From Swiss-Prot:
Interacts with DDX5 in an RNA-independent manner. Interacts with CDK9 transcription elongation complex under basal conditions. Following cell stimulation with poly(I:C), a synthetic double-stranded RNA mimicking viral infection, the interaction with CDK9 is decreased. Interacts with ESR1 in an estrogen-independent manner. Interacts with HNRNPH1; this interaction is important for the regulation of alternative splicing on G-quadruplex structures. ATP binds at A136, Q137, T138, G139, S140, G141, K142, T143. It comes from Mus musculus (Mouse). One of its GO terms (molecular function) is ATP hydrolysis activity. Residues 326-473 form the Helicase C-terminal domain. This is Probable ATP-dependent RNA helicase DDX17.
Length: 650
């Protein structure tokens, strides 16, 4: 039943607003704990204006589904429903949700054909005004699952008046995620003249305050900056009736629980609340119990910690000292791919800067992002990465959640994270939506405590498990592997294509270490040529292999580059190994003879010749100058970028 209230905005533009205007009038806070000036409001529901939040009309095709068909649809899409009263039937097409035509037009323009599993069940729940918890892997389409119902919700509320705060509030853990959500909100809200803003720390307050003062229906915010604005009276949440907690587990990991509780205390208790998370630990469960009323939990996939099944996960057990050499071998193969956008995750800001400096010194088109970077610099780096001008992004966990770049094909965990939850979110930066991707992980004995959890994640995703990883667990005292562990041990490669693939990946990770020819493909799904090569015994290193001395590939056996393979820099393998290649090749690669002597002391290329595609794609243009001066090293030559805009005065 629809609750009584204002109904459609077009019918009620003359109705009254939601209380006093202008904000709280509190003086700005300069010291103390965030949110200490905010007091929990005492709400009297009988005095609050009524509002409508149930707008769901079941489509006839959905209404005709029998209970058996509903169960079968949920089973096929791996949807599990728990709690609440009777849950609405899932939809299986966008038009079943009865969205307004302007929303359907945008969906069609973006070539969406059918809703994702989380959207199939999330749309009916959110449109019916119910509180809900959505548990799904990254890249599952949860942003649309709450934003499209939010647009419908807003358009059934009275118009904002001067001094009113937002109707829909989305809390996000990072500024990157907040910016991405706002972009989606702009794409779908502009057709209905809805305004949105994104407020986050690290950026000037002035433009954000002006947006709030002009009035926005949708506010996407990080907790810290929103607390600041609430305390200083720059905005209020009296009009907020639709609350979204996006990536709730991540916000708790980052220590935002006190701020979240302060913020929620400012919102009327009969609001509609939607919580989204990739994991379901006890801390998130407690938050749901405190903030949600009679909620329904929907889960897509396994209830345990799970990774995206579209990601091929490869774990290389190695020593800490081997990481640099293995990384360069890996990057040479990745950069030979047509689609090679890669994120490399490291543990600390210092290592992030150091690794970026060393890779750029040796010619890799790498840039970095971490929490100490200014907002203009972060925005510029992400734009360069998205555009493909710098296809290698080195990052700390600041980018492991919320960073949505559709065409990231590879993720490399240079340092294994502190928890399996962070591992799942890191590798979730690839294989967004229905795409496929590959994740490589360097796992050292120092990460032994996480071995069991990693094995569980691999087994759940039906991935092959590196025997060295199993040996680490056995050496520590067994356990954790379960039945899956014995299965991979006892099954032969001939009968287990997944394990055969893993064996081949291990062989290729070794690269030139064993003296074999370098390959120029990635470790992704095999083509028909690959399978035939493997089946007839030629393998990837055979003279008859598909990756032999062809045009566009270098010929290691002869030790010389052809002109077609390496442009004008035709120096020999012997010259490269000795560091004495000629001046002509040095000029074409944009390096000096002095920098060549430095090349082999850092994270330079492996003992093989440089990757040919790198010189073709990233050769120095005429008149180029250093790209970035902050590296503190002689950098590879690029066209100078436009400087980031100077921060405006607050």
């Amino acid at each position: 039943m629809r609750g009584g209230g204002f109904g459609d905005r077009d019918r009620d533009r003359d109705r009254g607003g939601f209380g006093a205007r202008g904000g709280s009038g509190l003086p700005p806070k300069k010291f103390g704990n965030p949110g200490e000036r905010l007091r929990k409001k005492k709400w009297d529901l009988s005095e609050l204006p009524k509002f409508e939040k149930n707008f769901y009309v079941e489509h006839p095709e959905v209404a005709r589904l029998t209970p058996y068909e509903v169960d079968e649809l949920r089973r096929k899409k791996e949807i599990t429903v728990r709690g609440g009263d009777v849950c609405p039937k899932p939809v299986f097409a966008f038009h079943h949700a009865n969205f307004p035509q302007y929303v359907m037009d945008v969906l069609m323009d973006q070539h969406f054909t059918e809703p994702t599993p989380i959207q199939c069940q999330g749309f009916p729940l959110a449109l019916s005004g119910r509180d809900m918890v959505g548990i799904a892997q990254t890249g599952s389409g949860k942003t649309l699952a709450y934003l499209l119902p939010a647009i419908v919700h807003i358009n059934h509320q009275p118009y904002l008046e001067r001094g009113d705060g937002p109707i829909c509030l989305v809390l996000a853990p990072t500024r990157e995620l907040a910016q991405q959500v706002q972009q989606v909100a702009d794409d779908y809200g502009k057709c209905s003249r809805l305004k949105s803003t994104c407020i986050y720390g690290g950026a000037p307050k002035g433009p954000q305050i002006r947006d709030l003062e002009r009035g926005v229906e949708i506010c996407i915010a990080t907790p810290g900056r929103l607390i600041d604005f609430l305390e200083s009276g720059k905005t209020n949440l009296r009009r907020c009736t639709y609350l979204v907690l996006d990536e709730a587990d991540r916000m708790l990991d980052m220590g935002f629980e006190p701020q979240i509780r302060k913020i929620v205390d400012q919102i009327r208790p009969d609001r509609q609340t939607l919580m989204w998370s990739a994991t379901w630990p006890k801390e998130v469960r407690q938050l749901a119990e405190d903030f949600l009323r009679d909620y329904t939990q929907i889960n897509v996939g396994n209830l345990e910690l799970s990774a995206n099944h579209n990601i091929l996960q490869i774990v290389d057990v190695c020593m800490e000292s081997e990481k640099d050499h293995k990384l360069i071998q890996l990057m040479e193969e990745i950069m030979a791919e047509k689609e090679n956008k890669t994120i490399i995750f490291v543990e600390t800001k210092r290592r992030c800067d150091d690794l970026t400096r060393r890779m750029r010194r040796d010619g890799w088109p790498a840039m970095c992002i971490h929490g100490d970077k200014s907002q203009p610099e972060r925005d510029w780096v992400l734009n360069e990465f998205r555009s493909g001008k710098a296809p290698i992004l080195i990052a700390t966990d600041v980018a492991s959640r919320g960073l949505d770049v559709e065409d990231v094909k590879f993720v490399i965990n240079y340092d294994y994270p502190n928890s399996s939850e962070d591992y799942v979110h890191r590798i979730g930066r690839t294989a967004r939506s229905t795409n496929k991707g590959t994740a490589y992980t360097f796992f050292t004995p120092g990460n032994l405590k996480q071995a069991r959890e990693l094995i569980k994640v691999l087994e759940e995703a039906n991935q092959a498990i590196n025997p060295k990883l199993m040996q680490l667990v056995d050496h520590r005292g067994g356990g954790g592997g379960g039945g899956g562990r014995s299965r991979y041990r006892t099954t032969s490669s001939a009968n287990n294509p997944n394990l055969m693939y893993q064996d081949e990946c291990d062989r290729r990770l070794r690269g030139v270490k064993d003296g074999g020819r370098r390959d120029s493909t990635s470790y992704r799904d095999r083509s028909e040529t690959d399978r035939a090569s493997y089946a007839n015994g030629s393998g990837y290193g055979s003279p008859n292999s598909a990756f032999g001395a062809q045009a566009g590939q270098y010929t290691y056996a002869q030790g010389t580059y052809g002109a077609a393979a390496y442009g004008t820099s035709g120096y020999t393998a012997q010259e490269y190994a000795a560091g004495t290649y000629g001046a002509s090749s040095t000029a074409s690669a944009g390096r000096s003879s002095q920098s060549s002597s430095q090349q082999f002391s850092g994270i330079g290329r492996s003992g093989q010749q440089p990757q040919p595609l790198m010189s073709q794609q990233f050769a120095q243009p005429p008149g180029a100058t250093n790209m970035i001066g902050y590296m503190g090293q002689t950098a590879y030559q690029y066209p100078p970028p436009p400087p980031p805009p100077p921060p405006s005065r607050k």
